[in-house]
A protein has these predicted regions:
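Interface-prone segments of viral and bacterial extracellular assemblies
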Residues: 1-267
């Protein structure tokens, strides 16, 4: 593999990959599901070549990290891979929304790529390349020239995950919104401790909307936001109003991360 930071005038080697990852496109839709729970539904994928193979693994192996794939931007795992036609598989017993991604609906034609660690190349690029247009190309043994693919680094692997467990408690017109952050530095459940921060400081961007209009946007440095009755009156949020809260943790290098949202009726 080689990359170019000067529009393709020159390329530098960045590493080697032994074999291509199985990839293809969805034949049937993958409907929205629940994050981090077993989904017993299935979807079908057509791989780009008959020589590409998928295999079933036990649920224990899947929980340990096997059969990880990206489907339209969501990270999915599957336990069962049934060959139903040449190059066509039915995948079932799914884990959705893995590695901080969001379980969403993906239509037929969405891209599928198996994330096999032995067939991936992780490249550690300097932060100053964020937002820059780079070019990459794969060069096989004996290849004289190969096409390049352009990519602008958006820093998705650096953005903080969306918070979870958005809640509100209201009394006497005052409201307190709370949430729980997640961390790229560790996403497992640990007894007696919180997830590591993963950033130099803890900060969040909070947006409150009602009726399709943003009523208030604030930044806070703790996983809660107090919304007093006086502020509600200024914003025109009457008792019984429906509001949408959006929260994103602020990253050191990328700014606001992936947003979480929830809708509430305020007393």
């Amino acid at each position: 593999m080689a990359s170019s930071v000067d529009g393709g005038d020159s390329y530098a080697a960045i590493g080697e990959i032994g074999a291509p990852s199985p990839m293809g496109r969805l034949v049937t839709a993958l409907e929205i599901g629940c994050d981090d729970r077993w989904d017993r539904r299935s979807f079908e994928v057509m791989l780009d070549g008959d020589a590409m193979l998928l295999e079933s693994r036990s649920e224990t192996a899947v929980l340990a990290g096997a059969n990880l794939a990206t489907v339209g931007g969501e990270i999915v795992q599957f336990a069962q891979a049934e060959l139903v036609a040449p190059g066509k598989y039915r995948l079932s017993n799914l884990l959705r929304g893995r590695r901080g991604s969001i379980a969403a609906t993906h239509p037929p034609g969405a891209r599928f790529v198996l994330l096999d660690p032995l067939r991936l190349l992780a490249v550690d690029l300097p932060g100053e390349l964020l937002g820059r247009a780079l070019r990459f190309r794969a060069v096989g043994a004996g290849d004289a020239a190969t096409p390049a693919v352009g990519l602008t680094l958006a820093g998705e692997a650096l953005r903080p995950f969306a918070p979870v467990f958005l809640r509100v408690v209201s009394a006497g017109g005052d409201a307190r919104f709370t949430w729980r952050r997640r961390s790229r530095s560790g996403f497992g459940w640990l007894d007696g401790t919180d997830a590591p921060l993963g950033e130099l400081r803890e900060a969040y961007r909070v947006t409150l909307s009602s009726g399709g209009t943003v009523r208030r946007e604030v930044s806070v440095d703790a996983p809660f936001w107090d919304y007093p009755a006086a502020a509600r009156a200024v914003d025109g949020i009457a008792p019984g109003a429906t509001v949408t809260l959006r929260v994103a943790q602020i990253g050191d290098m990328t700014g606001p991360g992936i947003r979480a949202s929830a809708t509430f009726i305020l007393n």
